[in-house]
Amino acid sequence: LRLARNLISEGATVYVIVQDKNDGIRDDKYLECDTDEKAMGTYEMPISQKKRLRQGMQYVNQLYLKHKLEGIQNQWMISIHIDSQPEESRQDVFFYYQSESKKSKKKAKKLQEVFSEKYEKYQGRDYNGSVSSRPLFVMRASDPEPVYVELANIRNQKDRERIILPQNRQILADWLMEGFLK
């Protein structure tokens, strides 16, 4: 949501496919989980993960076609996730691109460059996030150019700090926006 707000402030048209009317941008350290999310804020979402992904991509592709017919050419699908690996597995933010898309690969590399610069400047350490293609459903099914962002490993304490501190969530959104505007 923070990235969406940032992009809107720069004039972008942004759609958040999975919405929750009572869970906006929050500054609590721990965000309560619930199950009242809706697709596009209105439509029930299937329980099955496969059906949820298909439903989400149908909306993404419908919106892409609508705006393509209006002459909008620069359209992206940004899929943001938090991984759940074994606790000892720490990871920096990493990016996937659609293997057949030069634009998707270029954008993922731009995002990685921004994160590498910021890690060196603010954390004084090398950035170990990667860029690679991966045949995930959302990457294969997306009509707009896709980028998949993996923010952290929720089971690793250091990674959790990256996403539970509100100021860190804003920093992540700021860096992602910077990468998209490059």
Describe each PLM feature range:
Residues 1-4, 53-57, 61, 92, ...:
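Extracytoplasmic/secreted envelope proteins and their assembly/folding machinery
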Residues 1-89, 97:
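Catalytic-core regions of hydrolytic enzymes
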Residues 4-12, 61-68, 112-121, 168, ...:
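Sec-exported extracytoplasmic/periplasmic mature domains
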Residues 36-46, 65, 99-103, 144-159:
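Short, Lys/Arg-enriched charge-dense amphipathic segments
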Residues 75-77, 92, 144-146:
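Extracellular structured ligand-interaction cores
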Residues 83-86, 96-97, 121-182:
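Active-site-adjacent mobile loop/cap segments within catalytic or ligand-binding domains
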Residues 83-114:
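A short, glycine/acidic-enriched catalytic loop
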